């Protein structure tokens, strides 16, 4: 066997073993392993191995992007029944943005599995954020095609959703949503908002709101609208609760 073919066969055996270990790590075995390998195949690798039947991960990335948006949207819709469309959109955007996807990919050492061309490898492509984010989306696409939405949901439940529950993305929420998140995390009880006072002329109204947790006052706030007053009350409550932590 010519040395080059021997070297390529050895490399192929090595990455197939790596994918086997990866599947054991995540507790998922692909029915069609070709989909898994394709998810980690960068276009630069395909360009340098034209005689091999490899496909790059770009189409899977396209699909995975849509699947990820759908599943994260469904999770947020169920978890935050009172959150507005605008707030849900902001939170979803923070979860599926490039830095977040890179974080998820790095947690599972995706970079070490990517099949790269020599040029891309030499320029540090394995650690390039955009590449890692694309691979994560491609993996979601491959998982969806191989095993369906339920398995994708189970995977995200282990890797992505816990970070939402831990408050990793609360910085993009409004004060009321942040307060709700904090209370849900601690399992402390029910939050209620009350308008205590309305004052001033009709064209310049001021509202005073109080937020309570299990009938215990947490914060007061005022604003030009009921919504603004409630936000300010939630901000004060958040400040107090965080000081106690």
UniProtKB/Swiss-Prot annotation:
One of its GO terms (molecular function) is ribonuclease III activity. It is an enzyme of class 3 (hydrolase). GO terms for biological process: mRNA processing; regulation of gene expression; rRNA processing; tRNA processing. Its EC number is 3.1.26.3. Residues 174-243 form the DRBM domain. InterPro entries: dsRBD_dom, RNase_III, RNase_III_dom, RNase_III_sf. Its cofactor is Mg(2+). It catalyses: Endonucleolytic cleavage to 5'-phosphomonoester. Keywords: Cytoplasm, Endonuclease, Hydrolase, Magnesium, Metal-binding, mRNA processing, Nuclease, RNA-binding, rRNA processing, rRNA-binding, tRNA processing. It comes from the Bacteria. The active site is at residues 65, 137. It is found in: Cytoplasm. One of its GO terms (cellular component) is cytoplasm. Its main location: cytoplasm. Pfam families: dsrm, Ribonucleas_3_3. PROSITE patterns: DS_RBD (PS50137), RNASE_3_1 (PS00517), RNASE_3_2 (PS50142). Residues 19-148 form the RNase III domain. Mg(2+) binds at residues 61, 134, 137. Digests double-stranded RNA. Involved in the processing of primary rRNA transcript to yield the immediate precursors to the large and small rRNAs (23S and 16S). Processes some mRNAs, and tRNAs when they are encoded in the rRNA operon. Processes pre-crRNA and tracrRNA of type II CRISPR loci if present in the organism. Belongs to the ribonuclease III family. Homodimer. This is Ribonuclease 3.
